[in-house]
Amino acid sequence: MDIIPVLDLSRGTAVWAQAGDRARYEPVASALVPGAVGDPVALLKAFRVRLGASSCYVADLDAIQGGAVQRAMLRELAQLETGFAGAIMVDAGAHTPESTFEVLACGASQVVIGLETLRSFTDLAEIVRVVGRGRVVFSVDLRLGSPILHPTMQDVTGANPDALSLTGQAVEAGVCSLLVLDLARIGTGCGADLGLIGAMRRRFPALRLLAGGGVLARRDLDRMRDAGCDGALVASAIHAGTITASDLADLAAAPAGAQSPSVSR
């Protein structure tokens, strides 16, 4: 299983996300780079050099909330000599082919299309068609298990769609990589929704399945892997030092669904 460090960017600063309350996000102080509070460049370098990460997830909170894409910062991050072997995934609120290409032009390896900014699954299918399915990750954005929908999407999907039905529509649109992201769990250490992850894996066995929100310690990652997760997004636990380079190396050697003897059941 891959452990994917997270950079949340607000006005050029790396911030600490907590429970999805974006108004309260503060510059992040990380054990990886003491003294470099809120410095996204220093953090990205540390993710590779000190943590041994092979990929990174970047959320442009300005763009997600309707502002301009932080083009200069995204380009600077993408051009760093980090030696990343995997993808730099960027969520910058893209919801059309044009806005997706804008993010790719900033150096993203993959673009995250978030449920909270997507207008329709027709748009998602068109993005996958013109960009290529390997460059698209669909994010099922949740709050306490309930989908976060753009007002237009509410009209498209009908009343009270659940995460599994929305994932089914994303798969029909051509998506092959999916992220389950519960904003209410982010930065809380309450653990991931293992029941939902397991249900996603059983229903959609061919998907590359990622999840984020709620990781506190190594045992959370073991349980996510055992539930069928291919990759986990982690921020707070990395900055606190409870997830280390040795954890990343150990988990990279084990496939999703492999039972871990370190998990207490």
Task: Locate each region found by the language model.
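C-terminal helical cap(s) of enzyme catalytic domains, especially alpha/beta-barrels
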Residues: 123-130, 221-265
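N-terminal beta-alpha supersecondary unit
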Residues: 14, 18-68
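Short, small-residue-enriched loops and turns at beta-alpha junctions
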Residues: 62-68, 96, 144-147, 184-190, ...
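Short, acidic/polar
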Residues: 36-49, 96-101, 158-169
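N-terminal active-site wall of soluble small-molecule enzyme domains
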Residues: 49-106, 194-197
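Conserved anion-binding
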Residues: 9-30, 104-186
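Hydrophobic faces of well-ordered beta-strands that scaffold small-molecule active sites
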Residues: 2-10, 56-58, 86-92, 111-113, ...
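Catalytic cores of alpha/beta
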Residues: 87-111, 126, 195-234
